[in-house]
C-alpha cells in the first residue's frame, strides 16, 4: 500500500517528523510512506487564492493518489499548529482531495498526555463537511515525553510503544482497504468517439483530441505548439500514458510542469463529460502501483554532476570530451533547469562580429560618459583595466566621428560593465562588487564558450546582435531555435551520444566525504531507491534559490521587502539545494543578501516570454497613470525598484513595428493572448488606454514625447541611453508587467578554478561549483545575458579542473 505522511508542523526540529521517519523505515516492507513537509505551504488567505500553486497541487495529487494519509501532529496551545490548519484549509477551499480518504492520526509531544487534545481537535476538523475525511476511529497513538522516546538513530526505544504502533498500523491498513472498497467507483460507460476539446496550459490553449471507446480512454493527442519546449515535454509524454494505463485521472502532476499537467488532465475530463460520464468518478480511481522494496543502487563514475541545467550539462559534456565518465543527477523529471526558461542571448564581446552593426543613438554618449568617469570611483583591482578601456574608447570615438558609427565592444568593456553593473550597497550600508578574478575569468572566456557551443552543434543567429533587459550593452549571441531550449537540446544530445548518464527525478540528499575529500553523493530516485554515486570529484550545478521565497526572505539585505506571494520566473527546482549541500561540508557563502527581480514578468505567472518582450531599446514603460517612470535602458534592479515605487504593475507599450522585434512569439500566440485578455491591442492609443483603465490624454502625451526623444536621440526626462523605434504604427499594444524573483547572486564561495572554498578560505578537496549555485561573480546585480555566459564558462572550468586534479592523476 502507498501512504502519505504529513508532518503537522514547520518546525526545523520536530519529534513528529522523527515519528513519521521511524514509521517509514519500520513499516517499509509493508507499505510505502512518502513524507510531506509543510515548510513551504503559505498561510491560508481566502483573498489570496493559491490553490493552483505548485505546493498545494502537489499535496492534493499525492493525497488523492495514496491509499491513505497519516497525519503526525504536535500540540500547540491545546490544539493543532497553524501550519497544519492552513494546509487543511487549502485542501478544502476549492479542492477536496481528503474527501472520503482514509486518515490515521498520530502525535508526539513533550507532555505526558502526548497530543491528545490536538488529536481531538484534528478529528473535528477532518470531519467538517468541506474536508470529510474518513478518520480511523480509536487506536490513538499518543507519544508522550517525546524528547526521551527516541535513541540516537531515531528509533523508538521502548518495545511496548513499538508494539502498540504496530497494532495501530495494522488496523489502519485494514481500515484503508475497507475505505477504498467503499470509494470504488462504478464501471463507466462512454459514448464512443473522438472528442475535440481545448484545455489551458501554461502558455495558453492546448487543443486536444481524446478518443473513447464504450468503456475506455483509448488515445490522447495534444497540440503542444503553445508550450515551451524542454519544460512541458515530460508532461505531454507521461500524463497521457498514465491516464490510459490506469484508466484514471488521479495521476501525479509533473514537477516543474504542474500547470500543463493539470491542463492535460482537465482536457481529458472535459472529453469524458462530453461523452456522458462523470469525470469525478475517474478522479477517484487510483492507478495500481506496486510498492518497491527498499533497495540501494550503487554507481561508480569519474565525475558526478548535481543538476542538469546549462552549467551541469556543460560540465558533463566537458568531462566526456576529455575521455572520462560522467553521471548527472537531476531532481526534476526534465533536464534544463532555468536554462530552458532563458531568453537565449548570451553575452560575449566579439568586436569583429559586432562592428558590422551600426551604433544606436545614445550608445556613443554612453561610452563617452564612461571614459570621463573619475578613476577614483573604480575599485583598485579594476583600475588598470579601466585605464586600458579608456584608451580603447577614446580611439573608437576618434575614429567614429560621424553621427552613428559602428557598434563598439571589447572584453575590457564587458568586464568593467559587469563590475559596475554588480556594484551595489545593501540596506546596512555594505558595498559589494564582483570578485575581480572571477569577473576576469568570465569575460575573458565568454567568447570561447560561444565557440565551444558552436563546436558541439549550437547554431547562433549571426544576423543580429541582441541585448536582454538589463544587459546595458548589445553583445548578445542568440541561438537559433526556441529560447534556451536550443542549448539544452544540443547539450543533452551530446552528453548522451558521448556515453554520459543522466538520472532524472533523483534529488541528491548528501555528499560523500572520505578522508577529507568529497568523493560522491547519496540520492533517492523515483523508485524510492537509495542511489549512491562514487566519484573522484563532485560538481555542484543545481542553480540558485529564487523559487524559495522563505530562503530569499531569510537572507535578504537588499530589498526593503520580499512579499510572501511574489512570483518567480524560475523553475520550481531552484530552492537552494546545492547551497545546502555545500554548507553541509563547511563551504563559505558570499553575497547571499542580494537577489535580482526581473522587472518585465507576467503579473499572474511570473512568465518572462508572454506578451511582447522586445529589446530594451524599444521598451516604453508606462505606469498605471499612463506616464513613463524610468530609463528603460537601466539595470534590472533600477527598473524593478522604479516599478515597485509606481505600484509594481506597469505596461510595455508597443506598435506594429516594435511588435516585429519581439522575442520568442508568433502572431498566433499574440492573437490568443489578446483573446485571453492578457495582452491588449487597439487601433488607437486612446482605445488602448481605455482598455487598460488609464487616462487616454496622459498616454497619448507620453508617447508623443517619447517619439520626439527618439527623433532627437536624447531623453531629457529619464535619460534613456539608447533608442531604436518610435511608437507610431497601428495597431498598438500594451503588455502588463510586474517584477518577479529571477536570480540569486549569492551562493557558494569559489575561486577562479571553480573550487568550492570553506569558511577559512581553503579549497574543499574534490568539490566544485558552477552557475547560479556559486556566488561572487555578479555581486549585487547581474547583467542580463551574463548568466548564460557564466554557466557555460564556469561549467567548462569546473570540469577541466575536476578532471585534471582528480581523474587524470588517478588513471595516469
From Swiss-Prot:
InterPro entries: FAD-dep_OxRdtase_2_FAD-bd (IPR003953), FAD-oxidoreductase_2 (IPR050315), FAD/NAD-bd_sf (IPR036188), Flavocytochrome_c (IPR010960), Flavoprotein-like_sf (IPR029039), FMN-bd (IPR007329), FMN_Rdtase-like_dom (IPR005025), Succ_DH/fumarate_Rdtase_cat_sf (IPR027477)
Coiled coil feature spans: none
Membership in a protein family: Belongs to the FAD-dependent oxidoreductase 2 family. FRD/SDH subfamily.
Keyword Flavoprotein: yes
Protein name: Urocanate reductase
Main EC class the enzyme belongs to: oxidoreductase
GO MF annotations in UniProt: FMN binding; steroid dehydrogenase activity, acting on the CH-CH group of donors
EC number: 1.3.99.33
Keyword Transmembrane helix attributed: no
Binding positions for FAD per the UniProt entry: 311, 330, 338-339, 343-344, 577, 743, 772, 788
Gene field: urdA
Reaction catalysed by this enzyme: dihydrourocanate + A = urocanate + AH2
Other remarks in the entry: L.plantarum strain WCFS1 is significantly more abundant in subjects with type 2 diabetes (T2D) compared with subjects with normal glucose tolerance (NGT).
Amino acid at each position: 500500500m502507498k501512504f502519505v505522511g504529513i508532518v503537522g508542523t514547520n518546525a526545523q526540529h520536530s519529534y513528529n517528523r522523527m515519528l513519521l521517519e521511524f514509521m517509514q523505515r519500520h513499516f517499509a516492507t509493508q507499505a510505502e510512506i512518502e513524507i510531506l513537509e509543510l515548510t513551504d505551504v503559505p498561510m491560508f488567505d481566502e483573498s489570496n487564492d493559491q490553490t493552483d500553486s505548485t505546493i498545494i497541487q502537489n499535496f492534493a495529487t499525492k493525497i488523492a493518489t495514496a491509499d491513505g494519509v497519516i497525519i503526525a501532529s504536535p500540540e500547540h496551545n491545546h490544539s493543532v499548529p497553524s501550519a497544519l490548519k492552513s494546509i487543511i484549509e487549502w485542501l478544502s477551499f476549492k479542492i477536496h482531495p481528503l474527501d472520503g480518504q482514509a486518515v490515521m492520526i498520530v502525535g508526539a509531544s513533550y507532555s505526558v498526555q502526548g497530543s491528545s487534545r490536538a488529536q481531538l481537535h484534528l478529528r473535528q476538523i477532518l470531519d467538517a463537511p468541506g474536508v470529510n475525511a474518513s478518520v480511523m476511529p480509536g487506536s490513538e497513538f499518543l507519544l508522550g515525553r517525546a524528547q526521551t522516546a527516541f535513541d540516537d538513530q531515531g528509533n523508538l526505544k521502548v518495545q511496548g510503544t513499538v508494539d502498540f504502533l504496530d497494532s495501530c498500523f495494522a488496523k489502519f491498513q485494514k481500515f484503508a482497504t475497507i475505505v477504498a472498497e467503499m470509494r470504488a467507483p462504478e464501471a463507466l460507460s462512454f459514448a464512443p468517439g473522438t472528442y475535440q476539446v481545448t484545455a489551458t496550459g501554461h502558455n495558453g490553449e492546448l487543443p486536444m483530441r481524446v478518443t473513447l471507446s464504450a468503456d475506455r480512454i483509448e488515445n490522447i493527442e495534444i497540440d503542444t505548439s503553445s508550450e515551451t519546449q524542454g519544460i512541458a515535454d515530460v508532461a505531454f509524454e507521461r500524463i497521457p500514458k498514465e491516464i490510459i494505463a490506469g484508466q484514471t485521472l488521479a495521476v501525479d502532476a509533473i514537477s516543474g510542469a504542474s500547470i500543463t499537467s493539470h491542463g492535460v488532465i482537465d482536457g481529458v475530463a472535459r472529453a469524458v463529460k462530453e461523452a456522458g460520464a462523470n469525470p469525478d468518478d475517474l478522479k477517484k480511481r487510483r492507478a495500481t502501483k506496486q510498492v518497491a522494496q527498499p533497495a540501494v543502487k550503487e554507481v561508480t563514475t569519474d565525475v558526478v554532476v548535481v543538476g542538469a541545467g546549462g552549467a551541469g550539462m556543460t560540465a558533463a559534456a566537458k568531462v566526456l570530451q576529455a575521455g572520462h565518465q560522467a553521471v548527472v543527477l537531476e531532481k526534476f523529471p526534465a533536464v534544463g533547469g532555468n536554462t530552458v526558461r532563458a531568453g537565449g542571448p548570451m553575452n560575449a564581446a566579439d568586436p569583429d562580429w559586432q562592428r558590422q552593426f551600426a551604433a544606436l543613438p545614445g550608445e556613443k554618449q554612453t561610452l563617452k560618459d564612461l571614459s570621463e568617469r573619475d578613476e577614483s570611483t573604480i575599485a583598485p583591482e579594476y583600475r588598470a583595466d579601466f585605464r586600458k578601456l579608456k584608451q580603447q574608447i577614446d580611439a573608437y570615438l576618434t575614429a567614429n566621428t560621424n553621427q552613428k558609427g559602428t557598434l563598439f565592444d571589447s572584453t575590457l568593456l564587458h568586464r568593467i560593465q559587469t563590475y559596475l553593473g554588480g556594484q551595489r550597497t545593501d540596506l546596512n550600508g555594505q558595498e559589494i562588487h564582483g570578485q575581480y578574478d572571477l569577473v576576469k575569468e568570465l569575460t575573458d572566456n565568454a567568447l570561447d564558450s560561444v565557440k565551444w557551443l558552436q563546436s558541439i552543434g549550437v547554431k547562433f543567429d549571426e544576423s543580429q546582435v541582441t541585448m536582454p533587459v538589463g544587459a546595458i550593452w548589445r553583445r548578445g549571441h542568440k541561438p537559433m531555435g526556441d529560447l534556451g531550449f536550443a542549448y539544452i537540446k544540443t547539450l543533452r544530445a551530446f552528453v548522451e551520444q558521448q556515453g554520459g548518464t543522466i538520472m532524472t527525478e533523483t534529488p541528491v540528499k548528501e555528499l560523500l566525504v572520505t578522508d577529507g575529500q568529497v568523493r560522491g553523493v547519496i540520492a533517492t530516485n523515483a523508485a524510492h531507491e537509495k542511489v549512491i554515486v562514487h566519484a573522484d570529484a563532485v560538481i555542484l550545478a543545481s542553480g540558485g534559490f529564487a523559487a524559495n521565497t522563505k530562503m530569499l526572505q531569510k537572507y535578504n539585505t537588499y530589498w526593503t521587502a520580499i512579499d510572501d506571494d511574489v512570483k518567480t520566473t524560475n523553475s520550481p527546482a531552484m530552492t537552494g539545494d546545492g547551497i545546502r549541500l555545500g554548507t553541509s561540508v563547511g563551504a563559505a557563502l558570499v553575497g547571499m543578501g542580494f537577489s535580482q527581480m526581473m522587472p518585465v514578468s507576467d503579473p499572474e505567472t511570473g512568465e518572462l516570454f508572454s506578451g511582447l518582450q522586445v529589446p530594451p531599446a524599444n521598451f516604453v514603460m508606462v505606469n498605471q497613470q499612463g506616464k513613463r517612470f524610468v530609463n528603460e535602458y537601466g539595470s534590472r534592479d533600477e527598473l524593478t525598484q522604479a516599478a515597485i515605487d509606481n505600484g509594481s504593475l506597469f505596461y510595455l507599450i508597443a506598435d506594429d513595428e516594435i511588435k516585429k522585434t519581439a522575442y520568442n512569439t508568433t502572431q498566433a500566440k499574440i492573437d490568443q493572448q489578446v483573446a485571453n485578455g492578457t495582452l491588449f491591442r487597439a487601433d488607437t492609443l486612446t482605445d488602448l488606454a481605455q482598455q487598460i483603465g488609464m487616462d487616454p490624454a496622459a498616454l497619448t502625451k507620453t508617447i508623443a514625447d517619447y517619439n520626439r526623444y527618439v527623433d532627437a536621440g536624447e531623453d531629457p526626462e529619464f535619460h534613456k541611453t539608447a533608442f531604436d523605434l518610435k511608437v507610431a504604427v497601428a495597431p498598438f499594444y500594451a503588455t502588463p508587467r510586474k517584477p518577479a524573483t529571477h536570480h540569486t547572486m549569492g551562493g557558494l564561495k569559489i575561486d577562479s578554478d571553480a573550487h568550492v572554498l570553506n569558511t577559512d578560505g581553503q579549497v574543499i578537496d574534490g568539490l566544485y561549483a558552477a552557475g547560479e549555485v556559486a556566488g561572487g561573480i555578479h555581486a549585487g546585480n547581474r547583467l542580463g545575458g551574463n548568466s548564460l555566459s557564466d554557466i557555460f564558462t564556469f561549467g567548462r572550468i569546473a570540469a577541466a579542473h575536476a578532471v585534471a586534479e582528480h581523474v587524470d592523476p588517478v588513471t595516469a
